Amino acid sequence: MDVKIASDWKEILSEEFEKPYFRELTDFVRQEYASRRIFPRGSNIFRAFDKCPFDKLKVVIIGQDPYHGEGQANGLCFSVADGVPFPPSLQNIFQEVADDTGSPIPTSGNLDRWAEQGVLLLNAVLTVRAHEAASHAGHGWETFTDAVVRAIAQLKQGIIYMLWGSYAQRKGAIADPQRNCILKAVHPSPLSAYRGFFGSKHFSRANEYLQSIGKTPISW
């Protein structure tokens, strides 16, 4: 597996990479890439970490599964490459940013600009078969990303966790609300966004928290 990952993350997660489950996961993923159409491309599997080094981390957003449509997944949860139409959840995220902060809806769904400011856009499962949602669930990725969240919770404080939907909320439950800012809402999917994602004001609330602890706010 082409593990392109920021050096500080590599050091923090080095023991995880050596565990038997991760070796089995690596074998599975290599076999899948060799025999099937898998997203994102191999060099982007760990892109969320490469774009957001541990020492710059301010915000954690947890997704579930990469997009499984052609040309969509780029290694950051909810993000798509330049020129790719916005999936519905991303459209709703941008709508809430606009309503909350007054920022215009961007022309690109590429969230590199968030990651480079310290937003870890972490899917629970980092790979998927084309057109088969959750096809790589249950093979070890969840254990690995649980370890990521646990490392953040143990080594960092003053982190904002944006937990959208019950899956993300379970995964982020380890974070201490006394030492961090925990923002919860329903998932931005069209199935649920109108039940509390719209109007949650997570983006302005995140920036207020960052300013309160002397950190630069995110340009959403």
Locate each region found by the language model.
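Generic N-terminal amphipathic, Lys/Arg-enriched alpha-helix
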Residues: M1-L13
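A polyanion-binding, active-site-adjacent surface
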Residues: V3, E15-L163, Y167-R170, A175-P177, ...
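Short, conserved glycine- and acidic-residue-centered signature motifs
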Residues: G199
